[in-house]
Amino acid sequence: KEADNTQHIQKAIDEVGKYALDSEGIRGVVLLKAGRYNVDGTLNLTYDGVILRGEGNCFSDKDSTVLYGRNAAEKAKRLILMGNSSAHNWGNGKGDAQVNIVTQKVMPGDYSFQVEDASAYRAGDLICIKYPTTTAWLEAVWYGGNTKRNTDESKKWKTKDIDISYHRYVTKVEGNMIEVDAPIFYALDVQYAQAYIYKISNPETIRHNVGIENLHISFERSPENSTANVDQNCIYMSSLENSWVKGVSM
């Protein structure tokens, strides 16, 4: 129970990652039998079609699979990375055929909006919808709620800290109206910032059909680090499509 199992599990993940994809986009499953697995590092699920699966999600490792994250006091880390963390550049604000959104306010739940010129876009295009952080927007949200509570500048949100980026597929183009496959979930209001779209030039960096199933995750804790210096992310999901975490308890 004392040994670090990070490399053992990672080796199995890497091995399954070499398998060919089947007709449903799955390579295979890494099955962790019931028991406790100490994880001192980060498990990287970075292959299309690889699933990490346990044999139960109860607290006890007698009849369930328990991933036990250690060294939480020494460093903040990710226990599991799903996807491709290096693919964040799809939302960096740069891409092909950039054009402004002219709809004055795109509301949460909306699937469509008008742009200045949609002639470069077709159904099936992978795009980024970008809403940059501006001083006007930060003032409207009280710099993250901090201006009312304290004057500590270090705690205030800053421009470019939290730009809003949506990863979407174009489903319809009609004139200068563009419809996408999933709704907007934060209002894009032109009075605070100019939203725009562009084509994502590296869609191959997006991972598909990555899963974690049926296991329990726990962390090493002590009275000294029970409320501070804890792991920042238990499961960090980045640049994924059609991927899932189900039957996982913590």
PLM segments and residue spans:
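Ser/Thr/Pro- and often Gln-rich low-complexity regulatory segments
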Residues: 96-99, 105, 118-121, 139-140, ...
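Right-handed parallel beta-helix/beta-spiral solenoid domain characteristic of secreted/periplasmic
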Residues: 2-7, 51-110, 117, 179-195, ...
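A structural signal for beta-strand register positions
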Residues: 36, 56-58, 128, 216, ...
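Extended Gly/Ser/Thr-rich low-complexity repeat segments
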Residues: 121-135, 186-210
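Right-handed parallel beta-helix
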Residues: 133-167, 171-177, 213-250
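A short, structured loop/turn motif at beta-sheet edges
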Residues: 118-121, 171-177, 206-209
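N-terminal extracellular ligand-recognition/capping segment immediately after the signal peptide
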Residues: 3-51, 55-74, 119, 132-143, ...
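All-beta strand scaffolds that present successive hydrophobic residues in beta-strands
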Residues: 32, 51-55, 121-124, 211-212, ...
